[in-house]
Amino acid sequence: MRKLLLLSLLAMVSIFVHAGENDLCWDYTNKDIPSAGPDNGLYYAGYVNDGEGKNLSLHGVKLNSSGYAYFKKAAVAGKLKLVISNRKSTAEFKVDVCRGTMEGGKPVKGELIATTAAAQGPEEVVVDLDETVTGVYITRN
């Protein structure tokens, strides 16, 4: 009985310690991305742009045949969680997370926010995004 009580107490302490740690973490790894609409303060639009709208039904953020992914987000701070996995070869590679804008209906790569460490994949990375970032452009380094 004491063990059960102690385990319950430890679980509650763990929940309190970690509460709020990832309150605003956007995970594009294992979920469908809606074409529009709010999700924890984040708005998605044109997350994969490949010519005439190919690849728009992909799950998660995947780099298109042009080698990039783009989406819009609301002006709130948070974390972007990505899982890097190279499906074509075993070579390590990096990913650049940049500011992005739409100009003339096409995504444009802006200022570099972060470059991930070299990964062979699958490897999880988390990038902090501040409230001034309203468009994200992801590409291979």
Residue ranges and their predicted role:
Residues 83-85:
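Residue-level recognition of well-ordered beta-strand positions that form the cores
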Residues 53-81, 90-93, 122-126:
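Short beta-strands within extracellular/lumenal beta-sheet-rich domains
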Residues 4-13:
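Sec-dependent N-terminal signal peptides
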Residues 43-51, 58:
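A short aromatic-anchored loop/beta-hairpin motif
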Residues 15-20:
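Sec/Tat signal peptide C-region and signal peptidase I cleavage site
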Residues 21-40, 51, 89, 99-141:
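Terminal, low-complexity interaction segments
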